[in-house]
Amino acid sequence: MRGRWHFRCFSLALSPAAPDLVLRKPSIFTVQTEIFTLCDAATVAAGKLNILGSFDTIGAQSFPCDHPLCAVACKLRFDVGEEGRHWLEMHFCDPDMRPVLKPIRQDFEIRIPGHQSQTHIHIWQHLGFHLELPGEYYFELKVDGDTKSRIPLYVVQAQRR
């Protein structure tokens, strides 16, 4: 999923009665992941997502080790036509794609007044986890069962000073 792009297309239609060009929005909707990041902390204030210390690498002097505290911040965009009940799930897997944490699930509802897309912000706070070995771990975001984003967490052997 890394580096995957979603393109929105508009189609042109010519009507015999009105030969002017008409732009039509696509009829297929896709939830868009605007932000999905591992960070030191995150908050929402006045509808704004505030992220402190986004990172993708941690080091440990020895293994196994514990990472005591972090957060994962997520901002999704829903288009008109995607109203209703949804659920999201966050998975954290080791380099062999085995779960490090139990999947964390949240149910929510999207309401779209008018014709403007809406965002949903979710923050998983106070995450702590146990890491057996160095390697490339993954946080994966699923919306309604579909994988929307996967980000790496690089766990490395820290250099002694």
Task: Outline where the language-model segments fall.
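Intrinsically disordered, low-complexity segments enriched in proline/serine/threonine
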Residues: 18-21, 28
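Contiguous segments within soluble domain cores/interaction surfaces
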Residues: 25, 29-134, 138-161
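Leucine-biased recognition of intrinsically disordered, low-complexity hydrophobic segments
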Residues: 12-14, 21-23
